[in-house]
Each structure stands twice: as C-alpha cells, then as structure tokens.
Amino acid sequence: DFIYYQYYKNILRKSFCFFKRDDDADLRKTRRETLSAYQELIDNIVNLINRKGANQIRRANIFTTNYDLFFENASDKLLRNSTNFIFNDGARGLKTRYLQISNFHTSTWHQGTNDLYKFEIPTINLIKMHGSVSWRKVNEEKIEVSYPNSYPKDLEVDLDIPDIQTAIKLIEDFTLTHTAKESLALTNEDELALKEFRKEYDKLAIVNPTKAKFEETVFQQHYYQSLRLLSYELEKPQTVLICFGFSFKDEHIREIISRSLSNPSLIVYVFCYKHESKSEINELINNKKIIFIYPENNDDGHFIDLDRFIDCIFSVSGIDSMEGLTCSL
C-alpha cells in the first residue's frame, strides 16, 4: 500500500494535467509548452484527415499507453477555438458515460439545411490501452469515463511518512533486523490510512506497472479489444503507423506490430528519443520495413521531443527539421 501511495503522489497525480496557480513556475511553463505541442499535433492531424478523398473514411487513430489527459485537454482547447473535428474517447452516454470499444467505429456527417450536401467531419479516436486517470471501474463489466476539475478527494491523503528515496534507504539499512513497517516507522493510523487509500486507488481503471497488471477482468477485456482494434487497423491498405515515445517493451503490442509488417503497404516510422534507442528497439523488433528517425548524437538540441516530432512529420517550408537527425532502416 505504501508503494501505491508513493506512486500516486509522485507520478500518477501529475497525469491529471491540472494547471494550478500555486505550482512551480517552471512546471507551469513546461506544461503550457507540452499542451501547445499536443494542440499542434492534433491540429495537423485534422488538417491531414481533411485532405482525404470523398470515398475515404476521415478518421485517425491514436493508440497510447499513457494515463495522462494531455490529448483530452488539447482537443478540448481546439474545439473551443472552433476547430472542426470529432474527438472520440470511446465513451458513450450523456450525464454518465461508459467506455465502449464499438464506439471507435462511428463516423459523424454534417448535412446542409436543405439536404443539398453533406460531408464527413474528421474524427480522432483516442484509444488508451493501459487506461486513464479519468476512468473509474464501476463493476466487473463497466468503466465510467469523466473529466474532473480537481484531484480525486479520496486519493488526496497527506501522510507524514518517508518519501520513496528515504524509504528505500531505511529498508536497506534495517531489513535484516526490522520489518518494512518497523523500518519506515509506520504507526497503526498510517497503516489504516494507507489501506483506505488503496481501496480508493483500486477504483482507478489503469494498468499498474506490476506483474499482475491484468488481473482485473474488466481491464483484460478492454486491453484485448484494443489489441484487436490495433491489429485490424494495421491490416488495412495504405496505413501509416507513427511510433513516438514507445519502447516496444509491451510484448502484446509489439507482437501485433511485428505481425502487421507482412502488410505490403504498411509504413512504420519509429522516433527514438536518444541515439541509443534505435539499437535497443532493434533488439526487440527487427524488420527492414521500419524507418527509424533518431538523433545522430545526444547533444543538446538533437533529442527528439514532441515539438521535434511534429516538425519532422509535418515539416515547414524553409526549416530543416531533420538537422542533427538520422533517418534509416
């Protein structure tokens, strides 16, 4: 329970992407820049979808293993600024919305007042394969999707206990003579509070980075439905898969991508954050059809971040967006 508490407090809590006035100035700046990059990415995808022919489905799929809400927040901001597209998070309902994988197969059309014309509105599907901080498990069959304006009250527990680094050192120093509870000097009240925290934490519909990450039936169902959807999309003709920030260490997703490479018209781009990442990914999935884009070295300015990724895919005339990068098989 202690580890889950520290994981939420130090990592997962940031995934809500709230912009608070009392946050550190550098953190607020980084979040604004990140949100802006997400907006630019989505806006460019919408523009690209709009160029599709009349007989093509105007839809793009974003598969992600991230829990955070940057895609949702960026899309909301674009929609409020009148960018015309449908953002589909897979949920269906009005006041209460539930996740339904079949919702990713829908399209929306705009029709003229006198039915003289109609056109398909671009759709972006966001398929969150490992769940989201905006999801809650209702029961063994349902996941509720909602977007809170504040952190979950029942998870906002402030305990006077060691941070994770201090805890590791304490356990290492006293593991031969003390239990973990004794090493961390946890009181009975601390243990009780951690148990209550864990009960609320387990209501989050996310895949935890543990060996037992798919033990919940409801999440097994969602995950494998997502895999089938990914496989189906990659088997379509003239498909482009762009991988950014993905290590290929999820063996199920890696296997789907590996099998899909038999599709003769599939194009796969893999963006590597560091120079060494290409060889690390190559050890996991090695195919001559994969195009790697990676830094020539790890000097400042050559790292791949979201802004650089956008510049490379949607290059601007007059700007050499590939400077310092290598594009190879």
Please report, for each region that a protein language model flagged, where it lies by residue.
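Active-site periphery "cap/insert" segments of enzyme catalytic domains
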Residues: 1-122, 126-139, 221-235, 246-257
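Short N-terminal helix-initiation segments at or just after the protein's N-terminus
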Residues: 1-7, 61, 65-72, 174-189, ...
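Active-site-proximal helix-loop elements at catalytic-domain edges
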Residues: 17-31, 197-216
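Conserved beta-strand segments of alpha/beta enzyme cores
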Residues: 61, 125, 205, 289-291
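Eukaryote-biased recognition of electropositive, low-complexity segments
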Residues: 77, 105-193, 238
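Glycine-rich loops and low-complexity Gly/Arg-rich segments
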Residues: 87-89, 150-157, 266-269, 294-295
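Short, surface-exposed amphipathic charged segments that create phosphate/polyanion-binding patches used
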Residues: 101-106, 141-148, 304-316
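SIR2/sirtuin-family catalytic core signature
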Residues: 116, 167-197, 209-329
